[in-house]
């Protein structure tokens, strides 16, 4: 008889899958990426990802609360560190209907540009996506990485269950949000992709991660730092969400 050792990550995934049995409330959880000592990516002009993601998230929260009648919960509403496991726990504790994580992209190549939207998968769409997920998952030494290649049968079973539970809804939400980003921002459309982002694991509802633009690209950094562009990003995500809800996904 095989005996499984249940680690913290496995417990988190199992709890999320059990929480999925409960009916979803009219709550949307917005996750402003990074925060506190974990600044995220930094642009040439000194702008920090953590500040941009919070600004966009606050604008999105206001739009949803004003026009949709949903309760909106932020994983952070100020400049503080929030462990990745705690972010997904916020969604599950509030029985969230949707989870949206907001980020600003970064790359070694300063010419890299555009917007893209992700949903969870054990396997990354391509090598660039795998690299991005690795960097996000290892953004601080205080947080551990979920290693899909680990020889742990229980973790693999839970990973499969977690990624399949809401994959159709997450894929559709990502598609609609990305379509609105493309229509409103004028940035390169990098499409929708799948990646093993740790922040999306263990969330017991449809979940996406939005990379609004590249803060490592000086031109896009200036856009990301502007109130006008931040508002457009929030409005694009809002419109994609509205289309998703209207379709009764």
What spans do the regions from the language model cover?
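Active-site-adjacent mobile loop/cap segments within catalytic or ligand-binding domains
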Residues: 40, 158-249
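Catalytic-core regions of hydrolytic enzymes
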Residues: 21-154, 163-175, 179
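Bacterial N-terminal signal peptides that target proteins for export
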Residues: 1-10
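Hydrophobic h-region of N-terminal signal peptides that target proteins for export
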Residues: 11-20
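A generic, residue-level signal for flexible/boundary positions that often mark functional hotspots
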Residues: 12, 76-78, 114, 126, ...
